Amino acid sequence: MSVALRQVKANGVELNVALAGEGPAVLLLHGFPHTWQLWTHVLDGLAGRYRVIAPDLRGCGASARTAGGYDAGTLAADAEALLDALGETSAAVVGIDAGTPPAFLLAMRRPDLVRRLVVMESLVGRLPGAEEFLADGAPWWFGFHAEPGLAESVLTGHEDRYIDWFLDAGTLGQGVDPAVRDAFVHAYTGTEALRCSFSYYRALPESSRQIQEAVRTARLTVPTMAIGAHPVGSALEQQLRPVTDHLSGHVMENCGHIIPLHRPDRLLALLEPFLAPAGSTGSRGQLQHHGRRQ
């Protein structure tokens, strides 16, 4: 598989974008602490049928490090502008972790643009449904990352050990390919790189407000798939079900948070029939099953 890297200006920001394949567009939005290489093991499976668009999100990897704009609404605008810059008028959108809230808001705002939505291993703001997951509070690093300047001052010079912890925990101890690991460590090394990544957490109150406002005035009409693993499980599906017209939910057993690197084959088995354009075999049947364990 051939992957082309391009710098694309979108919403006023230079984004580093990996492009592969031809066909209907599939936009992949990574989370923390990732870059476009998060999708390394699923690109082959998707690029045979789709034009895969995998950016480094604003402030991450080789994309521009901006002073602000890390709220879900601005990130959704980045994604919309990226599709427009690449000449796409319709796309399936797949988000994981920090990529989920902007993917959700893009689908809410532009159901004419987003033909399928897949969201994984995240919560969408403070929508009801995640009470059990949050019973003991949010994961410890949320508060650590949210305090301005704190995490950067503690972690600068120790980024590799910190990233390794997330990669190990996110694959249930399996770890990731050394080349991918090294790419992530490089992308998140340095005080400014850390500031940008932690700005996602510092923007969570605004992102939550944007999500609450979106569901107050509209429903999610785009066919949607919610995929959970460890630790989020079915919490995302439970949040989405009251506000979504067409939703399928899946929880992957024995799978860590970083689904595309830990269980790429199982992820592809879910994505391939769901992402199929309207009229293709299996494109609609996926919406009839709820809470399926994988």
Model-derived regions: residue spans:
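Catalytic histidine-centered segment of alpha/beta-hydrolase-like enzymes
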Residues: 255-268
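Proline-centered flexible-loop/turn and helix-kink motifs
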Residues: 33, 48, 111-112, 245, ...
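Conserved HGGG/HGGXW glycine-rich cap/lid loop of the alpha/beta-hydrolase fold
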Residues: 16-62
